């Protein structure tokens, strides 16, 4: 006999619930046959990955918890290439939700508005490191959507979203030469800090975001207050060392549950474009 019970879950703070089944041989998540969870440490905080929980019709999907920040990433691809284009049609959307910070839209329609400037910049920040790793001759539409479900001020949802995206693409059947990961680096009182919290970000002399693979750095975004070159280089290298650990973690997840990459129709590439 199966008994359905609603147990409190922390995904949405006190308001989150998850359906569980009690069976004679113990409880099981009968609603989620492919449910898996993975855990690791990231810059001194626990990072938890959940897969097989939602969006089973997408090519790849996951939830990533970093502190109390929760981001869901979904990636889908068209089965056939788009006709009449000479570029890779990738779209990346970072969607903020007011309920992630405990608010409800106060407009007349009570609905979310257009993307904020921060959301647009975050979408571009995630696009830059992942786009070059797709096959240059692929023309299938690929859509990445990151949805912020909960926000912890001390744990960046932007970095969490980048990692969630890398995991979703890695475990999907979409061809990709990843994984990558990202990290935020600060400089507080002369000390390099990885993924600084809210208080540290308020007084940091360096606001650095690094994305990279196990072998190399693929994206740097930075703002600083007269930081010396050797300190900047040290911050980048220390950030990359932490990135390597997360990349290895993602590779392990991919080895366990990753799908076989599909074959795509190769489109001609104008190689003269790369020599100009």
Outline where the language-model segments fall.
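Glycine-rich, flexible beta-strand/loop modules in the N-terminal catalytic cores of phosphate-handling
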Residues: 46, 58-142, 148-150, 155, ...
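Short, Lys/Arg-enriched N-terminal segments with co-localized hydrophobic residues
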Residues: 13-30
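Mobile "lid/hinge" segments at catalytic clefts and subdomain interfaces of large enzymes
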Residues: 173-276
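Gly/Lys-enriched N-terminal cap/neck module of very large, oligomeric protein machines
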Residues: 52, 57-61, 143, 178-182, ...
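Short, Gly/Pro- and small/polar-rich lid/capping loops
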Residues: 31-56, 61-62
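Stable alpha-helical structural segments in soluble proteins, enriched in small hydrophobic residues
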Residues: 129, 160-172, 235, 242
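Intrinsic disorder/low-complexity segments
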Residues: 3-6
């Amino acid at each position: 006999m199966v008994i359905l019970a609603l147990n409190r879950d922390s995904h949405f703070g006190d308001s989150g619930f998850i359906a569980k089944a009690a069976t004679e041989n113990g409880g099981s998540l009968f609603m989620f046959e492919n449910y898996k969870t993975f855990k690791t440490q990231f810059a001194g905080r626990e990072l938890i990955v959940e897969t097989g929980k939602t969006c089973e019709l997408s090519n790849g999907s996951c939830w990533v918890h970093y502190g109390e920040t929760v981001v869901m990433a979904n990636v889908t691809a068209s089965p056939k290439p788009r006709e009449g284009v000479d570029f890779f049609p990738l779209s990346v959307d970072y969607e903020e939700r007011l309920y992630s910070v405990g608010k409800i839209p106060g407009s007349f329609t009570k609905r979310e508005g257009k993307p904020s400037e921060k959301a647009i910049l975050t979408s571009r920040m995630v696009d830059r490191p992942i786009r070059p790793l797709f096959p240059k001759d692929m023309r299938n539409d690929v859509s990445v959507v990151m949805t912020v479900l909960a926000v912890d001020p001390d744990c960046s949802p932007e970095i969490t979203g980048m990692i969630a995206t890398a995991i979703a693409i890695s475990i999907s059947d979409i061809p990709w030469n990843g994984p990558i990961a990202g990290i935020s680096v600060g400089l507080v009182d002369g000390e390099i800090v990885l993924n600084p919290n809210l208080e540290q970000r308020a007084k940091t002399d360096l606001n650095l975001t690094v994305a990279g693979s196990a072998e190399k750095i693929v994206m740097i975004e930075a703002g600083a207050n007269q930081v010396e070159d050797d300190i900047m280089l040290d911050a980048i290298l220390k950030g990359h060392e932490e990135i390597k650990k997360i990349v290895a973690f993602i590779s392990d997840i991919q080895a366990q549950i990753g799908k076989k990459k599909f074959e795509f129709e190769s489109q001609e590439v104008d190689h003269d474009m790369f020599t100009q």
